[in-house]
Amino acid sequence: MLPWTLGKLATLIDRLKTEASTDARLLFVDDGSRDRTWEIISEAAKAHCHVSGIRLSHNEGHQGALWAGMQESVATSDAVASIDADLQDDETAMIDMARQINDGKDIVYGVRKKRETDTWFKRFTAQSFYKLMKSMDSEIVYNHADFRMMSRRAVEALMQYPERNLFLRGIVRRLGFKEGFVYYDRRARELGESKYPLKKMLAFSIDGITSFSTAPLKFITFVGLTMTLVSLVMIMFGIIRHIEGNTIEGWTSLLVSLWFIGGIITTAMGVTGIYIGKIYVEVKQRPRYFVQERA
């Protein structure tokens, strides 16, 4: 897939120069792959002066790889754009992004017009995620992934965020600089297979929610208080029935109630544990990544 990607992006570089008066170069981030990815990047870097690459010592995840690419690029760039190597996002949208950056915008988001290339399940889960984030007062852009262009000062401001639990879609929006939007049609995947399965998507969603909102903790508190209130009412009801000489029967309802309460407690502990785990990771302040090789 990478040779195909290189060809498409080489054409884009020429168009950026002629249509947006912008010189560009490519930086590929190899996120600890075990196939021929780094070999292809190295050969491309030797053959083309506008191509370079970094190979991370181990897999840092999608957000970590994006961070590494921006941090490695910002010192020698007036603007930095990020795009996945499968080029399902329309790379030509970067021409309009560059124009807006040249006109004074600091962050230009690539926004999908539709989600026709997705399965119904992915459309449903994505839309549910965006709606959930919006209900929690998160400022992420609807139908925007991580396809964007940022000015140097925006990237430098982003680099000041110290957290290791990265959710760039949320962090970038909080920078507050001048924004622009470019709308594009996302392509169906032409080559290769997705390496972002459902398990990773769910983990990413949970990470995004817990990185930018304490709403799950507030919800647990609300559920706990509600159950306490219901329990008090039931206790009063039981006492009154006992005084009247009536015994409340129903082992089935008792067992169901116990299982229900046990499930809520376990879930609450799990959600609380996620937040505690995030604190644990942040407190250690480990390095974000290590570069094993450069090309």
What are these language model-derived features?
Residues M1-T119:
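Structured catalytic core of nucleotide-sugar glycosyltransferases
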Residues P3, A20, D118-T119, V141-H144, ...:
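Non-catalytic, surface-exposed connector residues within folded enzymatic/regulatory domains
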Residues T5-K8, L12, I40, G69, ...:
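A ubiquitous structural signal for well-ordered alpha-helices
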Residues L9, G69, D86, V108, ...:
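Residue-level signature of catalytic and energy-coupling elements of molecular machines
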Residues T11-D14, R99, K134, V281, ...:
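Regular, well-ordered alpha-helical segments
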Residues S52-H58, H62-E72, E91-L166, R187-L202, ...:
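Acceptor/aglycone-binding surface of glycosyltransferases and processive sugar-polymer synthases
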Residues F167-A295:
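Hydrophobic helical membrane-anchoring modules
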